[in-house]
Amino acid sequence: MRRRVASNLLWMLADRGLQVVVGIGVVAMLARALGTEGFAHFQYAQSLVFIAASIPLICSAEVVVPRLVARPAPEAAHALLAHAYAIRMTAGIAGYAMMCAYLAFTQQPADTWIPAAILGTAIMLREPFGVVIAWMQARTHNRPNVVFNLVAMAAKVALIGALFFTGVNLVPAYATAFAIEPLIAAALLAWYYLSRAPRTVPSRDASLTRDLVRDGTLFWVSFMLMVCARRADQLILKPLVPLAELGAYAATMQVLDNFTTIATILAAGIAPMYVFGQKSAEAARRNVLRVAGGMTAIGLCGALILALSAEWVVALLYGQAFGETVVLLRLAALASTLVFADVGLSLLPVFLRKPRWVAMKWALVLTTTVIVDLIAVPRLGTRGAVLGYAVGNAVALILGLVLALRARTATAIASA
């Protein structure tokens, strides 16, 4: 079992590692081609898409993967995935429509709404077709997804490189290149699963749909709150700081997003066997604490390296125009260690089927982040947003530890 988990993790980490390495070149070209203001418009559009993309998460992997592990029969898994896909696609279309409505209502400039409309097509692709990734995770076999990601990423990089070296500096052109990636990945995922799935078309099961929506709703609310907590800073910053400073802050968060995704990959690779596969809550709790401890150590080591090499990273990625990003990255990198610990601890409420707790946690994190940002940003500018990022992550970690302690107490009482 350990060898299988280790092999799966290596493939997932290799996938993310290659994405980060290639992302260095992509970000370097993007920042240099668009400049600080154009880069700020692009990142703001991505933030809007990121928030809207949380809507299809109403039937997330946290709901689908444990069910797939519990019912591995091909016909049962096929029916489950078909219903999850229908739910996600419906939500994805709604999410894209809501994003477009927001752009129209707020009368965003063309530099924002055009790239947002293009990038937003991913809302209807990533999560709906991502049910195949959940199927792979349940089988602890992520290698095909890694290959598909590489193919899609190669196409995106080729297009961006062509735009950059031909001197194109239009934000919509680069947004189109980014939108190609999820389209190719979705097509490959659909081909891979359908070539191996049962040939029968699952009949519509209203009770299964209700169960998936009901069980996924609180996790979905928590994801929505989490996404808002992660992107509220940029929405608050835009009217309060110059566009160039917003670009510097967005550059910092982009580096950290790439870095902290490693935590999600580690958790996704370990959870099916070491957490979701446990028979007792106490065994799962112990494993979650071990996972969280190991992930914290990895996060701390990575954060220290990132902070020490911040000047070199910024110069390589963004160039001299993003000098303010160096200080922001050093401060935020150290705070990102808390993200690794929180992601590990978040496996426990998923195992215990306590989405209400997750939703409450992220509601408090969002509230804390917004309050700190509204107080600190007018006084400290982008550094105030970094403070909000750190305090919000600390609140998430504390609440995760509280749940782990409560779970231990409840287990002790039940066994007494």
Language model feature labels by segment:
Residues 1-5, 143, 171-177, 187-230, ...:
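Interhelical loop/hinge segments that connect adjacent transmembrane helices in multipass membrane
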Residues 3-61, 214-243, 369-370, 389, ...:
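Signature of the first transmembrane helix
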Residues 7-23, 45, 49-50, 54-103, ...:
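Membrane-water interface segments that mark the loop-to-transmembrane alpha-helix transition
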Residues 23, 56-73, 138, 256-281, ...:
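Helix-loop junctions and terminal segments of transmembrane helices
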Residues 36-40, 103-119, 243, 307-340, ...:
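Interfacial segments at transmembrane-helix termini and the short loops linking adjacent helices
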Residues 42, 46-54, 226, 249-268, ...:
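Transmembrane helix-bundle signature of multi-pass secondary active exporters and lipid flippases
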Residues 113-120, 146-197, 364-368, 382-406:
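Hydrophobic alpha-helical transmembrane segments
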Residues 125-149, 334-361:
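Membrane-interface junctions at transmembrane-helix termini in multi-pass inner-membrane proteins
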